[in-house]
């Protein structure tokens, strides 16, 4: 239900940022101007659209999740009174969310509020990105560690490691080559060439560091699989950043405007702007929601706190993200004759409630900054969101470099602090 609330508010924010929807409402809703004046939203409801309206709505949603984050601190049993607040009262929660989003429009001194809230949103958005990058690095280490544990009993795991590593590096190399072909030209596109060279060099660097003797002595499980996963993600972020970069327009020898440094076939993808907007917005919502849900599991919160399973307890399996099938619990055994019921929260919560709400709190800020085009908020609208902007470009490039830095830290930290115990 929390995910449904989140989706409803995100869709509302996208509608508020759509100039097309605003014009359609003005054309087709009778007495539109009278209604806008009646609710004191301006002559054409300008207070209910644009980046300032999105800031207010996301402020209400962020406060909603932050309050529940505080209310659910230190809950270890799903039968406690405060746990019922988290797991029930859905109708009243919906009313509370609506009241908080609406109440944000009545905050006095709106200019000061919007300026201050913008910086809070930027910090929260970057924290949300940081959590995703940390979990990606942890995922790469966990994958290699789990499959390496299987080599002790079955040598076929070596072949699996080699095959997946080869696939990862093939994808990363192929992606960089294709971007060099389609996003650069013989004359010009120097920025794209530099960025591709830098990011390609970073992929080579992390690969060499991962297999260097000094790192191997401290971390025997370090290998090319982790660096291959990170290299693939760096390649993806590089492609995403170049795709988000504003098009460069120059004059050709005939005095006509020509767009350079983008694929020729990319021009046709933006002809139907409504289709691009709908598909792009749906993909954006889906990715953010997936990031929220995968970031709020018990294993992810344990990983962020540095708690991992002991190496001797690792059981190699293809689907290593899921717990291995063990013996039936008492409840499962009793239910074999009838429906199988698993009481997954009988002895404790399967995820940390407060951490769950905190991630959604950060996601609210990330949505606010993303939908309003980060620092180009004044000219932002959802129709031009996918045509590219410098703010989104540099956010993605910064995410790419931070991801590499985080991975390098996991490799180098044991060398810099030999007396400390590092477990990945």
From Swiss-Prot:
The chain crosses the membrane at residues 7-23, 53-73, 88-108, 120-140, 162-182, 194-214, 222-242, 275-295, 349-369, 392-412. The lineage of its organism: Eukaryota, Metazoa, Chordata, Craniata, Vertebrata. This is Serine incorporator 5. Keywords: Antiviral defense, Cell membrane, Glycoprotein, Immunity, Innate immunity, Lipid biosynthesis, Lipid metabolism, Membrane, Phospholipid biosynthesis, Phospholipid metabolism, Transmembrane, Transmembrane helix. The keyword Membrane applies. It is a multi-pass membrane protein. It holds the Pfam family Serinc. Belongs to the TDE1 family. It comes from the Eukaryota. GO terms for biological process: antiviral innate immune response; phospholipid biosynthetic process; plasma membrane phospholipid scrambling. Residues 1-6, 74-87, 141-161, 215-221, 296-348, 413-424 are extracellular. It catalyses: a 1,2-diacyl-sn-glycero-3-phospho-L-serine(in) = a 1,2-diacyl-sn-glycero-3-phospho-L-serine(out); a 1,2-diacyl-sn-glycero-3-phosphocholine(in) = a 1,2-diacyl-sn-glycero-3-phosphocholine(out); a 1,2-diacyl-sn-glycero-3-phosphoethanolamine(in) = a 1,2-diacyl-sn-glycero-3-phosphoethanolamine(out). The keyword Transmembrane helix applies. Residues 24-52, 109-119, 183-193, 243-274, 370-391 are cytoplasmic. GO terms for molecular function: phospholipid scramblase activity. Restriction factor required to restrict infectivity of gammaretroviruses: acts by inhibiting an early step of viral infection. Impairs the penetration of the viral particle into the cytoplasm. Non-ATP-dependent, non-specific lipid transporter for phosphatidylserine, phosphatidylcholine, and phosphatidylethanolamine. Functions as a scramblase that flips lipids in both directions across the membrane. Phospholipid scrambling results in gammaretroviral surface exposure of phosphatidylserine and loss of membrane asymmetry, which leads to loss of infectivity. Glycans are attached at residues 76, 146. GO terms for cellular component: plasma membrane. It is found in: Cell membrane. Its main location: membrane.
